[in-house]
């Protein structure tokens, strides 16, 4: 039995692939791309929310938002560690993102214009992320699957916090309800785009599904998200900006309108509303934080030398 046949056998049996196991080079590269982009999304995702920490309406909301952004930093570090088990360095992954050679989730290139946007990001954006990530808890690569289990627990808490913030606005004044509706109108379609292109236009899906890196297609996950979310929109007394949305009585699924893939393609090509601003902020943080990384490394080397002596 060749190494490749043994690998395929393990995938078929749903036995986790671990870092020291043999794996095809293309499998390793696919994982580095996916986990790296996932990590970048957590790190860049801190920016739109960080924008409101100093302007949160109450001390309680500020404490919640601080904790949430801190969680996202932790998720990013966790995922970079998972990627490093595949033999790449996080510095290289980060540099590729800064150079535009690796992507992050398109949703984070939209601005947060009001406090309602923060609630809607927690509810809709983290809600979409959870649909994606719960499926990844059974992905074929062990370190990635285990990272996802921890991250999903925290993300589901973020989503409940987001919905609670939206509920407070939905029960508030007319101006607050209008602010919430406006945020939903702006984030609904970008949230649906988070699942990636339609299955017939997704270049990496078939390979990823054959290797069980992905267990469900983009369109399946998008449908699941819509089915989960529309009843929540109704509880809030809000609507989504889709005149084609309707419940299909025979299937029990919601039918929704066509997504503007032109907007998605422009955003992932680096021409979205905030792409330039997001990368500039990350580049500045990377350069200004260099002394911290150098100091931590020097300290670790000193400790190591002391322990060796």
What are these regions (language model features)?
Residues 1-18, 40, 92-102:
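Acidic, low-complexity proline/glycine-rich segments
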Residues 1-6, 63, 68-96, 162-167:
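Conserved alpha-helical segments that form or flank metal/cofactor-binding pockets of metalloenzymes
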Residues 16-36, 96-122, 139, 172-176, ...:
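Acidic/His metal-coordination segments adjacent to aromatic residues that form catalytic metal sites
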Residues 22-27, 45-67, 129-144:
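Helix-loop segments that flank and shape redox-cofactor active sites
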Residues 27-38, 56-75, 118, 143-155, ...:
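Alpha-helical scaffold segments that form or flank carboxylate-/histidine-based iron centers
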Residues 108-161:
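Internal, conserved structured core segments that host functional sites
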Residues 139-190:
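Glycine- and acidic-residue-rich phosphate-binding/metal-coordinating active-site segment common to enzymes
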Residues 178-309:
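Extended, helix-rich structural scaffolds rather than catalytic motifs
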